[in-house]
Amino acid sequence: MSNENLSPNSSNPDLTKLNNGESGTIDTSKFSPNEMKLYKMYGKLPSKKDIFKHTMQKRKYFDSGDYALQKAGIQNNDPINYGKNNLPLTNPSKLREDIIKRRISTCPSTASTAGVVDNATLIQKEGSISSGPPSSNNGTIGGGSTSSTPVGNHSSSSSSLYTESPIR
């Protein structure tokens, strides 16, 4: 070979002289600019145009978890549709329906039959923070009467500040 500059950045290398012992010559006049650049850099063109798509088609497993599950003989029975490259395609409406069904099935008021609520559920609802203050009926939670004893080590003279008056 001659002392030509054959780097990928060189402006005018003669690629027809670079047949590397092949019997045929390469017609570079039909190459696109991108193909010409690749040929200058690597001396040949890649066999597949879309390399990423080609590698994804060869791939059997999405990740190591899928590989381990198949080796263990466990089949995934999820109703998820898979595309050509085995990536899950989500169905937003189906996902919303599943979430709503799950929430309804775990709700304690719908778990009881025909609107009959048992006492444990009623007490749990009354004692919860989100239900608000307890009702003012006779069945108060926590003993019934309020205590007006002073808190801490105070003298008995300070107990006159704490009178038994209902808060209304």
From Swiss-Prot:
Tell me the GO molecular function terms. protein phosphatase inhibitor activity; protein serine/threonine phosphatase inhibitor activity
- Gene Ontology cellular-component annotations: cytoplasm; nucleus; P-body
Q: Which family does it belong to?
A: Belongs to the endosulfine family.
Matching InterPro entries, A to Z?
Endosulphine
| Pfam families linked | Endosulfine (PF04667)
Please provide the record's keywords in A-Z order.
Phosphoprotein
Q: Which residues carry this modification: Phosphoserine?
A: 32, 64
UniProt PTM comment:
Phosphorylated at Ser-64 by RIM15.
Please provide the Gene Ontology terms (biological process) for this protein: mRNA stabilization; negative regulation of nuclear-transcribed mRNA catabolic process, deadenylation-dependent decay; positive regulation of G1 to G0 transition; positive regulation of mitotic cell cycle phase transition
The residue ranges flagged as biased composition, category Low complexity, are 1-13, 127-139, 146-168
From which organism does this entry originate? Saccharomyces cerevisiae (strain ATCC 204508 / S288c) (Baker's yeast)
Per the entry, what this protein does is: Required for TORC1 to properly control gene expression and chronological life span. Plays an essential role in initiation of the G0 program by preventing the degradation of specific nutrient-regulated mRNAs via the 5'-3' mRNA decay pathway.
Quaternary state and interactors: Interacts with RIM15, DHH1, PBP1, PBP4 and LSM12.
Record PANTHER family = ENDOSULFINE (PTHR10358), ENDOSULFINE, ISOFORM A (PTHR10358:SF6)
Q: Where is the composition biased (Polar residues)?
A: 17-31
Cite the residue spans of the region called Disordered.
Answer: 1-31, 125-168
- Protein name per its UniProtKB record: mRNA stability protein IGO1
